[in-house]
């Protein structure tokens, strides 16, 4: 079962990191954000991850798609809050 707290926590964390990521011009900062998000999703509720990932195992873990993924994750979480 996905709890309201887990949704709100994920939303807050991902929303904050996305805002920094999309405005950052520093590659090292973007890489650090990707690592932090990767670590976060490894530990988050599997059920919640599946709900926002559309079944993609590499969601929020693929460097080439990360910018799009983080935006989609925040949008999907906004819809279920």
Model-derived regions: residue spans:
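Intrinsic low-complexity, intrinsically disordered segments enriched in polar/basic residues
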Residues: 1-3, 31, 68, 80-81
């Amino acid at each position: 079962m996905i709890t309201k707290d887990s949704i709100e926590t994920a939303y807050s964390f991902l929303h904050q990191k996305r805002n920094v990521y999309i405005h950052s011009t520093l590659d090292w900062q973007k890489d650090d954000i990707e690592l932090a998000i990767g670590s976060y999703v490894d530990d988050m509720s599997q059920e919640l991850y599946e709900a926002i990932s559309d079944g993609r195992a590499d969601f929020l873990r693929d460097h080439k798609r990360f910018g799009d993924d983080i935006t989609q994750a925040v949008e999907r979480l906004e819809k279920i809050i």
